[in-house]
Structures are given as structure tokens and as C-alpha cells.
Amino acid sequence: MQSTLSQSPGSRFSQYMALTKPRVTQLAVFCAVIGMFLATPGMVPWHVLIGGTVGIWLLAGAAFAINCLVEQKIDAMMRRTAWRPSARGEITTPQILLFSAVLGSVGAWTLYTFTNPLTMWLTIATFVGYAVIYTLLLKPMTPQNIVIGGASGAMPPALGWAAVTGAVPGDAWILVLIIFVWTPPHFWVLALYRRKDYENAGLPMLPVTHGEKFTRLHILLYTVILFAVTLMPFISGMSGAVYLTSAVLLGAVFLAYAWKIHRDYSDELARKAFRYSIVYLSLLFAALLVDHYARPLLGV
């Protein structure tokens, strides 16, 4: 184990940042920010935008730090995650707990102060859903971990919406539903080409418990459902033609990947599909934002 005294402040900072899973956090916070803007026809007040963004990021980082702590032995057995400082023993359990507690406390205070109590409590509930219910209970016990546990990961748009309005109306839940349905195919393509990793770690991911063929079929089925669900913002009147066009085009590409995986699987194809799924969700929510402000300008 590397001595903590021999590390530079910059190296130590990078290790703690790694615990927050920055790439995953960025996507979650991005979806939350989009939720903020969709909640109002005008601009989001600056104190809400900044306070909400920072508070949600801090609590998300706190949840991911707990995830790294709980799964440090599992991470050490997987090639994809063995580099994490928690898996390498470079940060101790008390240090991770303290780090998570500080992030979570400051995040909760920030949300309470700059947004509203509802946003704070919803974000804390999301923290519990991910760090406790998903990480401790669902992930090691059932192949449906991603399906059930995806509820907590799908919450960011509702958190952003609540930060602005103090409520979570039907339109916000449509956005939550999109991410909820997107989550299984996104993670299952990863689990397909990382199947050996999950087998070695003893995690009951779908390809491990039900096989590759079953997983490929369910990726296709969930992607078809996702395509239909992404039409709901247009059907409900929340979004217009700009979003609809984007959703159809982006969804068609995702469907093409899912169909190819179902018919002619390869690890390289699964890697490409996994990377595209991240781009897909980012562009889909960006299209929601563009459509939201373009509709008044276009008079529709």
C-alpha cells in the first residue's frame, strides 16, 4: 500500500475526485440542469441554477464514494475498476466515509439554502436509493439490479425541476421515465463485453445469470420501449418538432445498434453501443433544451 505521506496534494485530490466517478456525475448533473431549464419558460434564477447544480453534484459524489467503499473488494477483482484508489487501498475506509459525509452534508445544506427543502429531501432519497438500496441490496443479489435500481439514477431531471418550481409535475416524471428505461440497455451492453469481470467478482448481472442470448434479446426489447417512451414529451405537448426529429433520429441509431447486437454480436460492437448510449442520452436532453427555447421563436 502506498504511503499517503508520499503523495502530492494534486495526486491526493485526483484520488478523492475519482471516488465521485466524475464522468457519471457529469451526465447526471447535466440531466438535472436540463430539468431546471425545462421547468420554466424563462431563465432559471442564478442562485437556483448554481446552488442546485453544486448541491446535486455534491450529493451525487457522496453516493458514488459510498459505492466505491462498499465495492472496493469487488472493484479490485475487475479489470475495469481495479485502478480505483479505493480498490487499490490508497484511501482508507474512515477517509472515504468522512469524505462522503462532508460532500453529502455540504450538498444538502446548499440545496436547502439555495433551492428548497423538497429538492434537498428528494436528492437525499436518491442518495439512499443508490448508495444503500442499489449498492448494498440489489446489485449483489439480483440480475434485475439495474432495472429496479435504475429508479435512483433516473431522478436527476426531477431534482432539477423541483429546484426551480418546488414541485415535480407529470412532465418531470416523463424525463425520469426516459432515463429509467435507458438504464438497462446502457448497462447490459457493458455487462456483455465485461461478462468475465462480473463472473470473477460474483455479481449476478444478466449475462452471467441468464446468458448472452437472453441479454441481447432484452437489450433490443428495452431499446424498442425506450424509442416509444422518448416520444412522450412530444405527445404530452412538452416538446415540439425539433425534439421529435432529434428523438427519432437518435433512437433509430440506438435501435440499429440493439438489432445488430441481437443478430450478430461482437464485443467491439457492444463497446460502440455502450459509448453511443451515453452520447444518445446527452444529445436527447440537449434536444429537449434547444426545443424548449426554440418553440417560442418559431411560433409553435
From Swiss-Prot:
Pathway(s) of this molecule: Porphyrin-containing compound metabolism; heme O biosynthesis; heme O from protoheme: step 1/1
One GO-annotated biological process of the protein: heme O biosynthetic process
TM stretches of this protein: 24-44, 46-66, 94-114, 118-138, 146-166, 172-192, 217-237, 239-259, 278-298
Record field: catalytic activity: heme b + (2E,6E)-farnesyl diphosphate + H2O = Fe(II)-heme o + diphosphate
Keyword Cell membrane (UniProt): yes
Membrane topology: Multi-pass membrane protein
Cellular compartments per GO CC: plasma membrane
Location (main, coarse): membrane
Subcellular localization, as worded in the UniProt entry: Cell inner membrane
EC primary class: transferase
Entry keywords, A to Z: Cell inner membrane, Cell membrane, Heme biosynthesis, Membrane, Transferase, Transmembrane, Transmembrane helix
Keyword Cell membrane among record annotations: yes
GO molecular function: protoheme IX farnesyltransferase activity
Catalytic activity, EC: 2.5.1.141
Coiled coil start-end: none
Biological role: Converts heme B (protoheme IX) to heme O by substitution of the vinyl group on carbon 2 of heme B porphyrin ring with a hydroxyethyl farnesyl side group.
Annotated family: Belongs to the UbiA prenyltransferase family. Protoheme IX farnesyltransferase subfamily.
Miscellaneous information on this protein: Carbon 2 of the heme B porphyrin ring is defined according to the Fischer nomenclature.
Name of the protein in question: Protoheme IX farnesyltransferase
Gene transcribed to yield this protein: ctaB
